[in-house]
Amino acid sequence: MYLYTLILLFLASVNVNAYADPGACSGNCWTHDPGLYQRKSDGKYFRFATGGGIHIASADSLEGPWTDDGYVLPNGSIIDLNGKNNLWAPDLHYRDGTYYLYYAVSSLGSQNSAIGVATSKTMEAGSWTDHGTTGIESTPASPYNAIDANWIAVGGTQYANFGSYWNNLFQVEMTNGLKVKSGATPHQIAYNASGIHRQEAAFMFERNDYFYLTFSGGIALGYNDTWPAPGEEYFISVCRSTSATGGFVDKNGVSCLNSGGTLLLASHGFVYGPGGQGILKDSSKGFVLYYHYADTRIGKAVEDYQFGWNQLKWENDWPSV
């Protein structure tokens, strides 16, 4: 009986400690669907978040202290859709001396959506120019929802990954960081066939000979009203491919187009519902997974969400936390 108890305690400790706790954060640590980038000129960190005209926070260290710097577009987007004053899901990239920030204009449960773009030379508040829609748009007649954009360049070709619920994740070729390539048609890159297809927040990155597609699944919010059934809250998964445009499979070889996905990060300890993730290639820490989560010691409302980050570990070219 004593041995059996020890075994149970050991298994419980393994489960609790399956993931590393988030890295340290001080100052303004609130975030929601974060976008994170390190400025090329001085290494300063800028963190962007869903809400209003896209929240801006900055710090000299990933650990903080983070300060609240205002908004990217304090007057909202020039895209004339419901939600233009409450922008979502920022995604950052840098190209030829300019920082690009993708954002989504939509409202909960709607497919009347568009992905917009703003540019800056510094990422500072007050420096951003809104260019409006990228041409990635959706209506109830579309097979996808045009939110949650993520940019990647492969050689000289640029792509935007996007999508949420409905038929999940899609990709389309871009002419540049501002507009979809004329005549380009989005194609599906991942799909969760179960239930109401809870999959969103694509983020793709390249390492060694692989392209990695991370995404969020599960229930993203509403935790202050009721806790989802265990395992149904937000979580982060990953697939990989030797091509950026398709063929993504999980660690077991299951296609991401057939509900595949290897769990990268899920609830553990005080961390509940991690998601809305991205990957930063940090100048000193290497590949860093960043995300928001509900800290059960603080609160479970969106207003209580916290900034989480972890350095990725690698085994056989698969990441873990």
From Swiss-Prot:
Tell me where it mainly resides.
secreted
Alphabetized Pfam families for the sequence = Glyco_hydro_43
| Subcellular location as annotated | Secreted
Q: Which domain of life is it from?
A: Eukaryota
Glycan attachment positions = N75, N192, N224
Q: Where is the signal peptide?
A: 1-20
Task: Supply the SUPFAM superfamilies for this chain.
Answer: Arabinanase/levansucrase/invertase
Where is the chain membrane-spanning? Answer: none
Q: Any idea which GO molecular function terms this record carries?
A: arabinan endo-1,5-alpha-L-arabinosidase activity
Query: Where does the record place the site Important for catalytic activity, responsible for pKa modulation of the active site Glu and correct orientation of both the proton donor and substrate?
Result: D148
Catalytic activity, as annotated:
Endohydrolysis of (1->5)-alpha-arabinofuranosidic linkages in (1->5)-arabinans
What InterPro entries does the entry give?
Answer: GH43_arabinanases, Glyco_hydro_43, Glyco_hydro_43_endo_a_Ara-ase, Glyco_hydro_beta-prop_sf
Alphabetically sorted, this entry's keywords are: Carbohydrate metabolism, Glycoprotein, Glycosidase, Hydrolase, Polysaccharide degradation, Secreted, Signal, Xylan degradation
List, from the UniProt record, the residues annotated as the active site of this protein.
D33, E200
Name under which the protein is recorded: Probable arabinan endo-1,5-alpha-L-arabinosidase C
